[in-house]
Structure formats: C-alpha cells, structure tokens
C-alpha cells in the first residue's frame, strides 16, 4: 500500500496559497484492507474512506469509463493493480493531476508543474470531454486564479467549445450549475467565469438572459464602454471589490437584464428596463434553483437600482415607500445591499471605476433616520390598529424630510 497527497492541496501549496482540504489516493490496497486499518467507508459509487483520526478523505486509486450521458454516466474500476498514473489521468487539468509522496517528492506524469509555471489551465486527456461539468470547473478555476495570470490553453478552450456545441451541457442539473456558479462568485474575479463561458458558447446555453446583453448598446454619454454585456461584467468585477457576499455579486450581475428586451429600434435608450428585467430575473433564478433570498434581492435590485441613482430628486414619501417596498423594516441588510449594487453599477463603467457614489451614503443615512423613529412613541400617543402604521409612516416621512433638508443636496 502506498499513499499520496493529490490534487488541490499539492497545487495550492506549490502556488504558495493556503491549503484548505487535503485529499489522498491509496495505491495497491483493497476496501477490506482499509476497513481493517480503521478507515470508515463513505463512498457509495467508488471506494472513498475517512481517516480514523484526521477524517480526511482517502480514495483507492481508480479509473473511470464513460458509460452514459452527462457527468454521472461513469463506471469506476478500483483495484490494487490501478497505478497512480492511471488515477491521475482521469483528472480534469494537469495542475490538478499532481501527487506528492511521503518524502515530499512531486509525481508529475502530465507536466502539471510546467503548466503551473506557465500559468496554463490545460486538460489532461481527451477524456475531459466526457464530463460536461468540467466546462464550468475550468471557468471557475480561470476566475479563481486570474489574479495569478492563469489562462486557458487554446486546445482546452477548443474542446470546451466542442462539448458545448455537441449539447453536452444540457445534461447538467440546475443544482450543479448553480453550485459551480455560486463557487465562482466567491472568487476574486468572478467576471472571468462568465467571460470564459461566453468564449466557449456556454453562456448562451446556461445564462441566455446574460448572453443576450452582449451587443446591446447603451448611450455613450453614460456608458463609454457602450456594450451592455461588457458593462454587466464590469459591474460584477466592481461588486467583487465592494463586497464578498454572493448575494451582492449575483444580484449585480442581474441588474440590467431588462435591457436585453429593448427593441433594437429604440436603442441605445432603455426606458423602463429595471421593472422589465424582473421577469427575466425570476426566470433565470427559477431555472437554476437559486435560493429564494438571493432571488428576491435580485428582483429588487433590478427594479430599483436606477431609482437610487436619482436619490436627491426623490421626495421623502418616495424614500420611505422604497424602504417599504424592499421590506427593509424586517430585512435591514437589504439597504446596504442595494447601496452596494447601485454603486457597482455606477462604477462599473469605463472611466468611472474610481468615482464617488454619494447616493449610497444618502440612502444609508436616510435609512438610519427612518428606522430611528420609535414605534413605542406612536402606541403611547394612543394610536390603535391600522392607525399605528399610518402614523408611524407619517412620522418617518417627516423625519426623512427634515434630514433631507439638512444633509442631502437639492437637485439642480
């Protein structure tokens, strides 16, 4: 029996990055031998075991053979005669097909070290094309390591295009697509994930609402980048700088979906694109089984982001009504999320990356003023039933009006 550290732990250690999870491959052993040594079997489809002390995963070396469609149609073979090289060959990328023995020596049968040095994401073998999930995984790796200068090898991108055009991605379940997307949204450069999907044709298949934005022009005065698809990825990049929250990043990505519905004869203007985009947000989120909380926020951001841009022109009644509309009294975090997504929208434009966004500050200040109006005082004043809400709203409007007079500049 020989045991090797494999995959991501080896890769990230060589890149000088923190190692989160360690996975091991066991060569020359059997399930019974692992059980006798105290390991606990957890793999149903192939033999994976948990170490009795560390609880890290130890998998018997195995090969995989395509036996059906999609990413689940594989038959696994695990036996003592499967070599380390056999096991590593089934992996997606050369940089993930590295192993380390107990002496610290790196085993590299597929030039993963060379690709690490050259910052290349390259597939190990043609078997890559048998698993459509790998298209998303490579896009996610491209986003995860973009800050280190990694790019996808030409032949790998070509294979990803071929897989997409062959309809392989249609076998992916919504849950898997969302999971990979969610993971990509946590990276430093999530916009790279969607750009890679567009480069290989997968964006049109998996995110048609976003793909439809490319080639749709916006007024150059407000959008020097002109192309709405480019603007969308720029706003996502900015959102990633402003917040680590997947909620903020995903909803920023969806903020302008309505512009994809504008008839070409009305370009480059997109009047009413915010409310128009709400149905597209719902459609996308329902298809991918996006969590309800994120879906609801995305709907609100699509509908109201342009309203925040005009904050100085809003009257106090409209501001308080906005807080009602986003259910801020029960979900106060939405105020901050709306401020961040609106800021990402403004700064996600060519030449505006460092722009100030005072509307976000004013939104936050107005919220602090409105929520500080005490409900208890209204009740103690003798109001009952529906009168309590009406009087509370009146007092909130009055408080915001007083604040706005002192703190918020009057529109020109």
Curated annotation (Swiss-Prot):
It comes from Escherichia coli O157:H7. Catalyzes the addition and repair of the essential 3'-terminal CCA sequence in tRNAs without using a nucleic acid template. Adds these three nucleotides in the order of C, C, and A to the tRNA nucleotide-73, using CTP and ATP as substrates and producing inorganic pyrophosphate. tRNA 3'-terminal CCA addition is required both for tRNA processing and repair. Also involved in tRNA surveillance by mediating tandem CCA addition to generate a CCACCA at the 3' terminus of unstable tRNAs. While stable tRNAs receive only 3'-terminal CCA, unstable tRNAs are marked with CCACCA and rapidly degraded. Mg(2+) binds at residues 21, 23. One of its GO terms (biological process) is tRNA 3'-terminal CCA addition. Monomer. Can also form homodimers and oligomers. Belongs to the tRNA nucleotidyltransferase/poly(A) polymerase family. Bacterial CCA-adding enzyme type 1 subfamily. Its EC number is 2.7.7.72, 3.1.3.-, 3.1.4.-. It holds the Pfam family HD. A single active site specifically recognizes both ATP and CTP and is responsible for their addition. ATP binds at residues 8, 11, 91, 137, 140. Residues 228-329 form the HD domain. Disulfide bonds: none annotated. Magnesium is required for nucleotidyltransferase activity. Comprises two domains: an N-terminal domain containing the nucleotidyltransferase activity and a C-terminal HD domain associated with both phosphodiesterase and phosphatase activities. It comes from the Bacteria. Its cofactor is Mg(2+); Ni(2+). It catalyses: a tRNA precursor + 2 CTP + ATP = a tRNA with a 3' CCA end + 3 diphosphate; a tRNA with a 3' CCA end + 2 CTP + ATP = a tRNA with a 3' CCACCA end + 3 diphosphate. This is Multifunctional CCA protein. The keyword ATP-binding applies. The keyword Kinase does not apply. Keywords: ATP-binding, Hydrolase, Magnesium, Metal-binding, Multifunctional enzyme, Nickel, Nucleotide-binding, Nucleotidyltransferase, RNA repair, RNA-binding, Transferase, tRNA processing.
């Amino acid at each position: 029996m020989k045991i090797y550290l494999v995959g991501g732990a080896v890769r990230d250690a060589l890149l000088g990055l923190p190692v989160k999870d360690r996975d091991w491959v066991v060569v020359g052993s059997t399930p019974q031998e692992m059980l006798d040594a105290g390991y606990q079997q957890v793999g149903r489809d192939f033999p994976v075991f948990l170490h009795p002390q560390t609880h890290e995963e130890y998998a018997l070396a195995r090969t995989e053979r395509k036996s059906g469609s999609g990413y689940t149609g594989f038959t696994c073979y695990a036996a003592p005669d499967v070599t380390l090289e056999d096991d590593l060959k089934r992996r997606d990328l050369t940089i993930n097909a590295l192993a380390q023995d107990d002496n610290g020596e790196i085993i590299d049968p597929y030039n993963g070290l060379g690709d690490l040095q050259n910052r290349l994401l390259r597939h190990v073998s043609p078997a890559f094309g048998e698993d459509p999930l790998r298209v998303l995984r490579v896009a996610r790796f491209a986003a995860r390591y973009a800050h280190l200068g990694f790019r996808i090898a030409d032949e790998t991108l070509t294979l990803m295009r071929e897989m997409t055009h062959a309809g392989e991605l249609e076998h992916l379940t919504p849950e898997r697509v969302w999971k990979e997307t969610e993971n990509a949204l946590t990276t430093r450069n999530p916009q790279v994930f969607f750009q890679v999907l567009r480069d290989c044709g997968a964006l049109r298949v998996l995110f048609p609402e976003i793909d439809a934005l490319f080639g749709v022009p916006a007024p150059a005065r407000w959008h020097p980048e002109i192309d709405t698809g480019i603007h969308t990825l720029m706003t996502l990049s900015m959102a990633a700088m402003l917040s680590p929250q997947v909620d903020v990043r995903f909803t920023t990505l969806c903020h302008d979906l309505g512009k994809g519905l504008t008839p070409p004869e009305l370009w480059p203007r997109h009047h009413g694109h915010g409310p128009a985009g709400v149905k597209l947000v719902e459609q996308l989120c329902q298809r991918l089984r996006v969590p309800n909380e994120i879906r609801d926020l995305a709907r609100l951001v699509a509908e109201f982001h342009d309203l925040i841009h005009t904050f100085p022109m809003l009257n106090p009644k409209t501001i308080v009504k906005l807080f009602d509309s986003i259910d801020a009294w029960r979900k106060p975090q939405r105020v901050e999320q709306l401020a961040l997504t609106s800021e990402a929208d403004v700064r996600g434009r060519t030449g505006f990356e460092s722009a100030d966004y005072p509307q976000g500050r004013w939104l936050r200040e107005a919220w602090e003023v409105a929520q500080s109006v005490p409900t208890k005082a209204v009740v103690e004043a003798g109001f009952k039933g529906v009168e309590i809400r009406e009087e509370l709203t009146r007092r909130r409007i009055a408080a915001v009006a007083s604040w706005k007079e002192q703190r918020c500049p009057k529109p020109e």
